[in-house]
Amino acid sequence: MREKRLLWVFILFGFSAFSQIKGIVVDENDMPIPYVNIWVENENIGTTSEEDGSFNIDTNDKNKNLFFSIIGFEKKTVKASQASKVVLQSITNELDEVVIFNKKESKEIQIGIVENTIFQAFDNGPKNDIKFFPYNPKYNKTKYIKQVKIATDSKIEAATLKLHFFAVDENGFPGSELLKKDLIVTIKNGGKSTKIDVSDFNLIMPKKGIFVGFEKLMIENNKLERTSIDRNTNLTVTQKLYYPFVLYNYVQNHVGFTFLSGKWIRNDDNKAGRYEPVISLILTN
């Protein structure tokens, strides 16, 4: 077995005069919506609504816009000062035509396997990240996506994250969501390769490729606090960590995407390479 080394990178943020915005997200029937992705517009500040729809988010300007996004509902932008109660309108989906899938599941291949054995974990706050899987004609014989494997590390027994599948749009960016509802995944304690069975969704590998990614859930059930003494001030500092950590490895591909304020931004200025989440797919026939 090859040795896999894990490096930890903790990025600490300095805090200025932030004020906390508290609110709740509900649907048109006044029912709470959990796991809504919430961002401060044009800033790397985000959070997730709790099971009861409540949320807290820090901003130094109440005139800033907050962006709300979740599968199955229309996206919405609201002033921070007016976000005590945010109502999202559900999207009415037409009934899908019943399709019979003639799956055999007698053959499997794994794609996206990483060769670099040095994995890194970054705890840098709210995060949506993706990995691109290009199409190959040989996948035609194993076109169904059966499983997702994602390398994780957690200090909590039942941490959760959200998985996403995106089509490729006309500009090569992550486009429409391929699932019609959230896929919340439970991650067990420890460092491991977590397998997620997605065969019930009948996902077929698109001819333009597919983006597969995760969304970190900044909720209380995923939070672990630890205290330490600041050597400069001799004061006790409390650090909040949100699990699970998704592991990354370094790749030569310099083109990547960053999710900011509800949209994907292309990054291709790092010619040396970049870090990519360790995700692979199991395809079957």
List the model feature ranges, each with a label.
Residues 36-46, 71-73, 102:
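Short amphipathic beta-strand segments in non-cytosolic proteins
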Residues 94-168, 216, 220-285:
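Beta-sheet-rich sandwich/jelly-roll-like modules and their strand-loop junctions
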Residues 67-79:
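A short, solvent-exposed loop/turn motif at the edges and junctions
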Residues 44-54:
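Short, acidic Ser/Thr/Gly-rich low-complexity loop/linker segments typical of extracellular
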Residues 21, 27-42:
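Short, ordered, surface-exposed loop/turn motifs in non-cytosolic proteins
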Residues 1-24, 285:
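Bacterial Sec-dependent N-terminal signal peptides
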Residues 160-233:
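Aromatic- and Gly/Pro-enriched, solvent-exposed loop/edge beta-strand patches characteristic
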Residues 21-27, 53, 86:
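A short, amphipathic beta-strand motif
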